[in-house]
Protein backbone atom coordinates (compact mmCIF):
# COMPACT_ATOMS: atom_id res chain seq x y z
CA UNK A 1 0.00 0.00 0.00
CA UNK A 2 2.90 2.37 0.63
CA UNK A 3 4.04 1.95 -2.96
CA UNK A 4 0.48 2.62 -4.18
CA UNK A 5 0.36 5.78 -2.06
CA UNK A 6 3.70 6.93 -3.45
CA UNK A 7 2.53 6.17 -7.01
CA UNK A 8 -0.64 8.18 -6.42
CA UNK A 9 1.27 11.14 -4.99
CA UNK A 10 3.87 11.05 -7.77
CA UNK A 11 1.15 10.97 -10.43
CA UNK A 12 0.16 14.47 -9.27
CA UNK A 13 3.64 15.87 -9.94
CA UNK A 14 4.72 17.57 -13.13
CA UNK A 15 7.04 16.27 -14.39
CA UNK A 16 6.36 12.83 -12.96
CA UNK A 17 9.35 11.00 -11.46
CA UNK A 18 10.56 7.97 -13.39
CA UNK A 19 10.17 4.42 -12.05
CA UNK A 20 13.67 4.34 -10.54
CA UNK A 21 13.02 7.56 -8.63
CA UNK A 22 9.65 6.32 -7.38
CA UNK A 23 11.31 3.09 -6.23
CA UNK A 24 14.04 5.08 -4.46
CA UNK A 25 11.37 7.15 -2.69
CA UNK A 26 9.53 3.99 -1.59
CA UNK A 27 12.75 2.38 -0.36
CA UNK A 28 13.71 5.54 1.56
CA UNK A 29 10.26 5.74 3.21
CA UNK A 30 10.39 2.07 4.17
CA UNK A 31 13.90 2.29 5.62
CA UNK A 32 13.05 5.49 7.52
CA UNK A 33 9.97 3.86 9.04
CA UNK A 34 11.97 0.75 9.92
CA UNK A 35 14.66 2.86 11.58
CA UNK A 36 12.13 4.82 13.65
CA UNK A 37 10.38 1.68 14.82
CA UNK A 38 13.70 0.05 15.70
CA UNK A 39 14.39 3.00 18.00
CA UNK A 40 11.00 2.47 19.69
CA UNK A 41 11.47 -1.27 20.26
CA UNK A 42 13.27 -1.06 23.65
CA UNK A 43 10.56 1.22 25.04
CA UNK A 44 7.79 -1.05 23.73
CA UNK A 45 9.48 -4.12 25.20
CA UNK A 46 9.72 -2.49 28.60
CA UNK A 47 6.17 -1.11 28.61
CA UNK A 48 4.64 -4.37 27.37
CA UNK A 49 6.13 -6.25 30.32
CA UNK A 50 3.93 -4.34 32.76
CA UNK A 51 1.08 -2.79 30.75
CA UNK A 52 -1.32 -3.89 28.03
CA UNK A 53 -0.68 -1.76 24.93
CA UNK A 54 -3.12 -0.75 22.21
CA UNK A 55 -2.05 0.99 19.01
CA UNK A 56 -4.51 3.61 17.70
CA UNK A 57 -3.56 5.08 14.33
CA UNK A 58 -4.80 6.85 11.25
CA UNK A 59 -3.42 4.43 8.65
CA UNK A 60 -4.17 3.01 5.20
CA UNK A 61 -5.54 -0.46 5.98
CA UNK A 62 -2.36 -2.48 6.37
CA UNK A 63 -1.01 -1.42 9.76
CA UNK A 64 -1.08 -4.92 11.25
CA UNK A 65 0.97 -6.21 8.30
CA UNK A 66 3.44 -3.34 8.72
CA UNK A 67 3.97 -3.82 12.45
CA UNK A 68 4.28 -7.57 11.89
CA UNK A 69 6.93 -6.94 9.21
CA UNK A 70 8.76 -4.61 11.60
CA UNK A 71 8.54 -7.16 14.44
CA UNK A 72 6.33 -5.03 16.69
CA UNK A 73 2.95 -6.79 16.59
CA UNK A 74 3.72 -8.91 19.65
CA UNK A 75 3.71 -5.83 21.89
CA UNK A 76 0.10 -4.81 21.21
CA UNK A 77 -3.05 -6.32 22.67
CA UNK A 78 -5.05 -4.66 19.88
CA UNK A 79 -4.56 -2.45 16.84
CA UNK A 80 -7.22 0.17 16.12
CA UNK A 81 -6.68 1.44 12.58
CA UNK A 82 -8.79 4.22 11.10
CA UNK A 83 -9.13 2.63 7.65
CA UNK A 84 -10.49 -0.56 9.23
CA UNK A 85 -12.79 0.90 11.88
CA UNK A 86 -14.23 3.76 9.82
CA UNK A 87 -13.35 6.60 12.17
CA UNK A 88 -10.24 8.81 12.16
CA UNK A 89 -8.36 10.89 14.67
CA UNK A 90 -9.15 13.42 16.03
CA UNK A 91 -12.60 11.87 16.56
CA UNK A 92 -12.63 10.63 20.19
CA UNK A 93 -14.56 7.56 18.99
CA UNK A 94 -11.35 5.96 17.71
CA UNK A 95 -9.82 6.31 21.18
CA UNK A 96 -13.02 4.94 22.72
CA UNK A 97 -12.41 1.77 20.68
CA UNK A 98 -8.94 1.57 22.24
CA UNK A 99 -10.42 2.01 25.71
CA UNK A 100 -12.92 -0.77 25.00
CA UNK A 101 -10.13 -3.06 23.73
CA UNK A 102 -8.31 -2.63 27.04
CA UNK A 103 -11.44 -3.18 29.11
CA UNK A 104 -10.37 -0.54 31.62
CA UNK A 105 -11.97 2.72 32.72
CA UNK A 106 -10.54 5.71 30.79
CA UNK A 107 -9.02 7.25 33.92
CA UNK A 108 -6.77 4.17 34.25
CA UNK A 109 -5.45 4.55 30.69
CA UNK A 110 -2.48 6.63 29.59
CA UNK A 111 -2.61 7.73 25.96
CA UNK A 112 0.80 8.60 24.54
CA UNK A 113 0.75 10.66 21.38
CA UNK A 114 2.70 13.10 19.26
CA UNK A 115 -0.14 15.43 18.28
CA UNK A 116 -1.96 17.71 20.66
CA UNK A 117 -4.99 18.01 18.36
CA UNK A 118 -5.18 14.44 17.04
CA UNK A 119 -4.10 12.46 20.12
CA UNK A 120 -4.03 14.33 23.40
CA UNK A 121 -7.19 16.46 23.28
CA UNK A 122 -9.55 13.72 22.01
CA UNK A 123 -8.18 11.15 24.48
CA UNK A 124 -8.43 13.62 27.35
CA UNK A 125 -12.04 14.34 26.39
CA UNK A 126 -12.81 10.69 27.25
CA UNK A 127 -11.13 10.98 30.64
CA UNK A 128 -7.86 9.27 29.68
CA UNK A 129 -4.58 10.48 31.09
CA UNK A 130 -2.25 11.82 28.42
CA UNK A 131 1.43 12.16 27.62
CA UNK A 132 2.58 14.29 24.70
CA UNK A 133 5.85 13.23 23.08
CA UNK A 134 6.87 16.15 20.95
CA UNK A 135 10.00 17.86 19.74
CA UNK A 136 8.16 20.72 18.08
CA UNK A 137 7.67 23.98 19.96
CA UNK A 138 4.09 24.70 20.92
CA UNK A 139 2.54 25.40 24.29
CA UNK A 140 1.96 22.11 26.11
CA UNK A 141 -1.45 21.57 27.65
CA UNK A 142 -1.06 17.88 28.37
CA UNK A 143 -0.39 16.55 31.88
CA UNK A 144 3.18 15.80 30.85
CA UNK A 145 5.45 16.54 27.91
CA UNK A 146 8.51 14.57 26.84
CA UNK A 147 10.86 16.46 24.55
CA UNK A 148 13.65 15.06 22.41
Which residue ranges define each predicted feature?
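Surface-exposed cleft-lining segments at the edges of enzyme active sites
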Residues: 25-34
